């Protein structure tokens, strides 16, 4: 399938409403983003660079050309001119994260590279590029810095705990936006859902019988049936301890957005001529 290249798009057309509202509020705090870009961001960039070079496989056009080509393709579709650095680390759960703003680097697990097909990997990389495009990284790196080893002073710990709870709530919601960017990158909702099914725990020996309809049924059953007061309390308490939103929830939110027609509107509106 020939993918449409997207250009001059308004990222606010893509963002999840809750992510957009919180991010706009953070961006309006005077000097806050500038402060982060001059303090927390360089520290996290340096920390990640040292860790990635010292304990990971640096993926380049020379070292791993096929994987690097997936990243170049994702950047080309989304109009990201500066291709970020890419590292693979040994961990078999299919995960990824990114750090940096000016010096942006994506770190992807070896398991993701092994378990995902090419188009699935493009969705996965597009998700991380989405965090970068949307301006999430300074605030995400602030939250990540609060978990770093040097945060051991009691007064700093108390302050960081107050900041962590609302910031972690936004951190999870930012993934809903990044998933949208991911599917705009791979341009196939089934590819995005296959990634989520694999990450949700489908055994590798069942990959040849992935049932997307069954997963979507599970997702919508979860959203529609677990709505009692006790269920709501259990959901809230469970989510507070999670770094990321549940895969089933992410699938439901992404599919609802796709089915609403917003995905196609963005493709039609911002496709390169």
What does each of the following model-derived ranges do?
Residues 141-162:
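Divalent metal-dependent catalytic cores for phosphoryl transfer on phosphate-bearing substrates
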Residues 116, 125-134, 177, 181:
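Active-site His/Glu-centered metal-binding helix of metallohydrolases
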Residues 71, 108, 127, 178, ...:
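Divalent metal-coordination and catalytic microenvironments
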Residues 62, 107-123, 166-173:
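Short pre-active-site segment immediately N-terminal to the catalytic Zn-binding motif
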């Amino acid at each position: 399938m020939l993918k449409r290249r997207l250009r001059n798009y308004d990222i606010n057309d893509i963002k999840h409403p809750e992510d957009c509202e919180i991010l706009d509020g953070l961006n309006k705090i005077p000097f806050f983003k500038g402060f982060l870009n001059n303090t927390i961001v360089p520290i996290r960039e340096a920390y990640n660079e040292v860790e990635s070079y010292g304990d990971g496989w640096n993926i380049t056009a020379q070292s791993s050309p096929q994987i690097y080509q997936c990243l170049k393709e994702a950047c080309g579709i989304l109009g990201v001119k500066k291709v970020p650095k890419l590292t693979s680390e040994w961990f078999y759960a299919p995960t990824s994260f990114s750090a940096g703003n000016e010096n942006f680097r994506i770190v992807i697990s070896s398991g993701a590279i092994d378990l995902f097909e090419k188009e699935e990997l493009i969705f996965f990389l597009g998700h991380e590029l989405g965090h970068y495009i949307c301006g999430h990284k300074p605030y995400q790196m602030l939250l990540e810095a609060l978990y770093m080893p040097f945060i051991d002073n009691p007064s700093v710990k108390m302050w960081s705990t107050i900041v962590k709870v609302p910031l972690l709530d936004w951190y999870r919601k930012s993934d809903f936006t990044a998933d949208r960017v991911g599917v705009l990158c791979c341009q196939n909702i089934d590819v995005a859902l296959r990634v989520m099914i694999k990450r949700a725990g489908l055994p590798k020996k069942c990959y040849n019988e992935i049932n997307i309809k069954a997963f979507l049924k599970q997702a919508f059953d979860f959203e529609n049936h677990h709505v009692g007061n006790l269920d709501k309390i259990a959901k809230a308490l469970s989510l507070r301890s999670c770094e990321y939103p549940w895969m089933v929830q992410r699938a439901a939110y992404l599919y609802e957005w796709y089915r609403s027609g917003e995905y196609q509107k963005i493709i039609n509106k911002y496709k390169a001529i």
